[in-house]
Amino acid sequence: MPIKIVTDSSITIEPGIARELDITIVPLSVTIDGTMYSDDDLKFEDFMVKMAASKNLPKTSQPPVGVFAEVYEKIAAEDDEIISIHLTEALSGTVEAARQGGMLSGRNVTVIDSDFTDQAQKFQVVEAARLAKAGASKEEILEKIKYIRENTELFIGFSTLENLVKGGRVSRMTGLFGSLLQVRVIGTLKDRELNTLLRGRGSKTFYKWLEELSDSISSSGRKIREIGISHAQGLEFSQKAKEVLQKFVEKPISILDTNTTIATHTGPGAWAIMIDYE
């Protein structure tokens, strides 16, 4: 039996790819004005409308330990192997819930902190699933996941910091001071920490940085395997980023709506550029 690959709904992935590669996605949930929704049940566009209308910041929740245990028991027999790759513990307790669920299930589960989320998490999950489908061993898959993790960059742009302030996460972004709600901020997720790269006023902050990123990639000479762009009502900049960066990678760049978990913290107008280097 091929090794089973599991992840969570903080991943941003094309549904067709998940089906084709038999990737099991365990849904996180979000509570808006007292009503809990599973990521399975709430379309992203509907979520953004509900979040905008809500007086309070939605509350995101990791899957319960018991849900992970049930999933593992359902998809694999006792002798089968499972690799479960998840949202970084810097942002959620999902990894720990998966570990406990693995122990409870009695299955052979290896749980991995992706150190990332969104399409940066997808890079690891998709490659693991492709290798599993091809009959690779657990050791081969884990080695490849580690390589991708160590050669991935994630940049994120915030058009507003209102949700970060409400969620108490601004303190996690070093270097943020002053008038927080009016600035544009670009950060990076590295070594399980969200750090500030740049801040300024107006959308020109994003476009100037994009030029600098392009110049940096050009001068580095590093080859790129894949680029993913995700956004929360930040399509205009995302399309410009694809236009600027497509020349660096053969594979077409995916522009996707992010997920409810990430959008809760970023607020509207946010985007992320994720780069998987060869």
UniProtKB/Swiss-Prot annotation:
Keyword Hydrolase assigned: no
Domain of life: Bacteria
Domain DegV: residue ranges: 3-277
Swiss-Prot/TrEMBL keywords: Lipid-binding
Keyword Nucleotide-binding: no
Role, per record: May bind long-chain fatty acids, such as palmitate, and may play a role in lipid transport or fatty acid metabolism.
Gene responsible for this protein: yejH
Matches recorded under Pfam families: DegV
Name recorded for this polypeptide: DegV domain-containing protein YejH
Binding site for hexadecanoate: 60, 92
Organism annotation: Lactococcus lactis subsp. lactis (strain IL1403)
UniProt-recorded Gene Ontology molecular function terms: lipid binding
